[in-house]
Amino acid sequence: EVCSEQAETGPCRAMISRWYFDVTEGKCAPFFYGGCGGNRNNFDTEEYCMAVCGSVMSQSLRKTTREPLTRDPVKL
């Protein structure tokens, strides 16, 4: 999955400002791209990053969200 890949600068040395989706934070974050190599989690704008990967956050929340535990009152 594109959106779960780590930010990867690549082997070149350009300092191109790009965005990647950070699954830990559940949002897009800036990073510097070297200009070659790298991976597909590399977007020109934050808006485009969120358009592609924003649903990943809601899908992962649905998988990890559980019903709250209900407890019977303790009787002494």
From Swiss-Prot:
It is found in: Cell membrane; Membrane; Perikaryon; Cell projection, Growth cone. A motif (OX-2) lies at residues 56-76. It is a single-pass type I membrane protein. Its main location: membrane. The record marks R13, A14 as: Reactive bond. PROSITE patterns: BPTI_KUNITZ_1, BPTI_KUNITZ_2. GO terms for cellular component: clathrin-coated pit; early endosome; extracellular space; Golgi-associated vesicle; growth cone; perikaryon; plasma membrane; recycling endosome. Disulfide bonds join C3-C53, C12-C36, C28-C49. PANTHER family: BPTI_KUNITZ INHIBITOR DOMAIN-CONTAINING PROTEIN, KUNITZ-TYPE PROTEASE INHIBITOR-RELATED. The OX-2 motif shows some similarity to a region in the N-terminus of CD200/MOX2. Binds, via its C-terminus, to the PID domain of several cytoplasmic proteins, including APBB family members, the APBA family, MAPK8IP1, SHC1 and NUMB and DAB1. Binding to DAB1 inhibits its serine phosphorylation. Interacts (via NPXY motif) with DAB2 (via PID domain); the interaction is impaired by tyrosine phosphorylation of the NPXY motif. Also interacts with GPCR-like protein BPP, APPBP1, IB1, KNS2 (via its TPR domains), APPBP2 (via BaSS) and DDB1. In vitro, it binds MAPT via the MT-binding domains. Associates with microtubules in the presence of ATP and in a kinesin-dependent manner. Functions as a cell surface receptor and performs physiological functions on the surface of neurons relevant to neurite growth, neuronal adhesion and axonogenesis. Interaction between APP molecules on neighboring cells promotes synaptogenesis. Involved in cell mobility and transcription regulation through protein-protein interactions. Can promote transcription activation through binding to APBB1-KAT5 and inhibit Notch signaling through interaction with Numb. Couples to apoptosis-inducing pathways such as those mediated by G(o) and JIP. Inhibits G(o)-alpha ATPase activity. This is Amyloid-beta precursor protein. It comes from Macaca mulatta.
